Amino acid sequence: MNVSFEDVVEAGARCLQQEGVEPSTAEAVVRHMATADLWGRHSHGLTTRFAAAVASARSGAGRRRPSVIDDAGARLVLDDTNGFGYGAGVMATDHLIERAGDHSLASVALRN
């Protein structure tokens, strides 16, 4: 049986969403884990970490959302409130690219 990468991501994200994880965070978590498996980094892949991600979601960690705690134009600090980190990393990268375009130079810090 062959299953496409996108089908794996979609199915895994649906599982996390059923536990209350926001769609964009669920997709980021599963996409990163599935990519780790594709690259042979199974210690960070679905087979090793997905069950723990579901357990974290059930405990409420997956329902937390990153928040901006300091915004100074080219500098931004985000707090992930002990969430998954995957979605916050994507958010931080998106902010960094946008702010670098606006200010020619930018920094984004991500904590917790």
Predicted feature locations:
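N-terminal and secondary-structure boundary signal
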Residues: 18-20, 35-42
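Active-site cofactor/substrate anionic-group-binding motifs, chiefly glycine-
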Residues: 44-100
